[in-house]
A protein has these predicted regions:
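Conserved glycine-rich Rossmann-like NAD(P)H-binding loop of the short-chain dehydrogenase/reductase
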Residues: 27-44
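Residue(s) in the substrate-gating loop at a strand-loop-helix junction
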Residues: 142
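Conserved glycine-rich cofactor-binding loop
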Residues: 13-15
Length: 247
């Protein structure tokens, strides 16, 4: 499905991002995964190579909030492979602090990584995709961008900004054959969720009509569909993968 495609996946060392990287590799893509630290990036790449030594996977650890660092790293990837077909903006941080615990710096930190950093990847990639005649940009949103959450206001705010960015860029970049979509996961079995107390998790599962948590692979399958030619006429969509929890 992704043979001869070159993809960048930010936040690709664990959880949903790692599952997306693996799914893309299974379907023939060449993938460069971005992570925050050299150690975790190296470990993730080695883990994937152990699964299949023929997979074309490598890693990098640019500071996502540094526009110059991102431009430089993306330029290296373009020089090495000749093109960039897919950008997955998956890196981000969550938040559950009540409003009385907030500071301006706290809010800005979350917005910086969850929104501003996305643009640091999109801007150089868009120029490359325009030159090559098209491409695909995928963003990780969240169920709470649609329904909100009772605390941690910065996180749903940042993810709603991701939705707006997705809708607007889809309209602007469509004439250049660049598709822009987002995936909005619900409660997904990741390290972060697994660390929650069981007494907190079960009530959440009870609210999901399918009566189970999502798996990282469920979300990765949505990314695969949107990245593939099966979604060649799909752009400007926020694809919910939440078991109808938000309904």
């Amino acid at each position: 499905m992704l043979k001869n495609k070159v993809a960048i996946v930010t936040g690709g060392t664990r959880g949903i991002g790692y599952a997306v990287v693996e799914k893309f590799l299974q379907n023939g893509a060449t993938v460069v995964l971005f992570g925050s630290r050299q150690e975790t990036v190296t470990k993730a790449v080695a883990s994937l190579k152990e699964k299949n030594e023929n997979w074309e996977v490598s890693g990098a650890w640019p500071t996502l909030t540094d526009a110059d660092a991102m431009t430089a790293e993306i330029s290296k990837i373009k020089d090495k492979y000749g093109r960039i077909d897919i950008l997955v903006n998956n890196a981000g941080i969550s938040d559950s602090a009540p409003i009385e615990k907030y500071t301006a710096d706290h809010f800005s930190k979350i917005m910086d990584l969850n929104v501003n950093a996305i643009m640091n990847g999109i801007l150089p990639v868009v120029e490359i995709m325009k030159q090559q005649g098209g491409g695909c940009i995928l963003n990780t949103s969240s169920m709470v961008s649609i329904c909100g959450q009772p605390s941690g206001v910065a996180y749903p705010t940042s993810k709603y900004a991701v939705n707006g960015l997705t809708w607007s860029l889809a309209r602007e970049l469509g004439p250049f054959h660049i598709r822009v979509n987002a995936v909005a996961p619900g409660i997904t079995r990741t390290d972060m969720v697994a660390a929650l107390p069981k007494e907190m998790i079960q009530p959440l599962i009870n609210r999901i009509p399918l009566r189970r948590m999502g798996e990282a692979e469920d979300v990765a399958n949505a990314f695969l569909f949107l990245a593939s030619d099966m979604a060649s006429y799909v752009t400007g969509e926020i694809l919910s993968v939440d078991g109808a929890m938000r309904s």
